[in-house]
């Protein structure tokens, strides 16, 4: 098959959806399929390159302005640059895809490539990554409005087949986009196990002068959906019992409320913010940690699953039925707390720091669970089976 993979976010940009799109593209190519990845320009990345067995084209893009608010996003829009509509369609005309894999329901490249697929009657999968939700009433209202008047009408016209990663995503998509079993597949997040089989690139404890005390790593961009507030508000209790604890927040800060709250609580000195780090360094941060947690507002995303795979005890905030068909057992093969529950975070962290043997046992079981169910090779095969079925159905209808 010829498969076009489309995502505004793509390496060298860091982030879960960027890494997942690139990893799946590499897997498709490794299995003998011809792959074209189309994304938005980013930093000094080449406009056109071949890597890992497939071609990557980066279209010129306009960056979203940084408004200096407590919430800002590093996003780029390709549709605003003159000629990009024509460039994109020419690329796809020349490539002649059998199917298109879109990533991100609110990205303009997904919409443009989706329009191409609709016009040419091509099967398309749309993976839902980030959910447009926020605990902040103002932002939450704005996101809901955008979903209602912009995103949902576009998706209703495009009619993609949805790929939904977890129960939170299922509930969200049913409510916002009217999805159902008839137009959806439920595949887990793909975790690149190979990235954690390489030598560590960095001595994180030495790099950040962490010493030998307990370290909590919280990895992933700070956005309203992952605001770090439950962890910050748990810190006074944690530090009271384990005064040497350091929290290392890894990722860009687009929502800085947690830093202000840390100042109010007098725990800011225990927090180190690194900014974004290369994908290759992520295993080193997990290896330096005693505990990893950042999905505390409801969720268990790529970073949390990678942390579990690495063999570090990881706390998330989902229910045991979060991944259809995958058995999660709190306290055995996963560590779960209720969303936005700082008291539960504090008690879980303290218990884990008090009992290194239990911490190591749960970490071992988490790693085995992720390796068995979320491995990139397993998830890629599920996507390819779906593409093959959709392509056959499309050929019959032509």
Go through each PLM region and give its residues:
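Short alpha-helical donor nucleotide-sugar binding micro-motif in glycosyltransferases
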Residues: 276-277, 284-289, 307-308
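Donor nucleotide-sugar binding/catalytic pocket of nucleotide-sugar-dependent glycosyltransferases
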Residues: 57, 133, 144, 148-200, ...
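Acidic donor-binding loop of glycosyltransferase active sites
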Residues: 99, 287-299, 312
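Nucleotide-activated donor-binding/catalytic signature segment of Leloir-type glycosyltransferases, i.e.
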Residues: 259-276
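Conserved acidic donor-binding segment of nucleotide-sugar-dependent glycosyltransferases
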Residues: 329-342, 351-356
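Short hydrophobic beta-strand element within catalytic cores of glycosyltransferases
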Residues: 313-322, 335
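Conserved donor-binding/catalytic core segment of Leloir-type glycosyltransferases
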Residues: 210-226, 232-235
């Amino acid at each position: 098959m010829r498969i076009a993979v489309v995502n505004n976010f793509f390496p060298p940009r860091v982030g879960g959806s960027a890494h997942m799109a690139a990893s799946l593209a590499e897997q498709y190519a490794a299995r003998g399929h011809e792959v074209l990845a189309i994304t938005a320009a980013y930093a000094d990345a080449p406009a056109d390159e071949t890597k890992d067995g497939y071609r990557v084209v980066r279209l010129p893009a306009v960056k979203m302005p940084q408004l200096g608010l407590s919430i800002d996003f590093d996003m780029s829009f390709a549709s605003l640059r003159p000629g990009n509509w024509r460039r994109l369609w020419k690329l796809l005309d020349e490539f002649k895809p059998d199917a298109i894999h879109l990533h991100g329901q609110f990205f303009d490249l997904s919409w443009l490539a989706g329009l191409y697929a609709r016009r040419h009657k091509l099967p398309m999968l749309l993976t839902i990554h980030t959910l447009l939700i926020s605990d902040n009433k103002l932002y939450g209202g704005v996101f809901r409005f955008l979903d209602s008047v912009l995103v949902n009408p576009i998706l209703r016209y495009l009619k993609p087949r949805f790929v939904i990663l977890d129960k939170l995503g299922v509930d969200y998509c049913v409510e916002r986009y009217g999805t159902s079993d008839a137009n959806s597949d439920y595949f887990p997040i793909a975790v690149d196990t190979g990235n954690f089989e390489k030598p560590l690139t960095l001595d994180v404890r030495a790099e950040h002068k962490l010493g030998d005390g307990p370290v909590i790593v919280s990895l992933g961009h700070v956005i309203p959906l992952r605001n770090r507030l439950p962890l910050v508000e748990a810190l006074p209790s944690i530090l009271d019992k384990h005064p040497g604890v350091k929290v290392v927040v890894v990722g860009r800060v687009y929502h800085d409320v947690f830093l202000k709250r840390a100042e109010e609580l007098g725990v800011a000195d225990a927090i180190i913010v690194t900014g974004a780090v290369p994908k290759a360094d992520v295993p080193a941060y997990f290896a330096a940690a005693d505990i990893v947690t950042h999905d505390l507002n409801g969720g268990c995303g790529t970073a949390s699953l990678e942390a579990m795979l690495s063999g570090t005890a990881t706390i998330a905030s989902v229910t045991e039925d979060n991944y259809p068909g995958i058995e999660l057992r709190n306290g055995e093969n996963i560590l779960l707390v209720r969303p936005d529950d700082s008291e539960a975070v504090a008690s879980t962290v303290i218990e884990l720091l008090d009992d290194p043997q239990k911490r190591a046992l749960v970490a071992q079981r988490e790693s085995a669970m992720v390796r068995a169910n979320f491995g990139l090779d397993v998830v890629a095969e599920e996507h390819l089976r779906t593409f093959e079925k959709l392509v056959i159905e499309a050929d019959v209808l032509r």
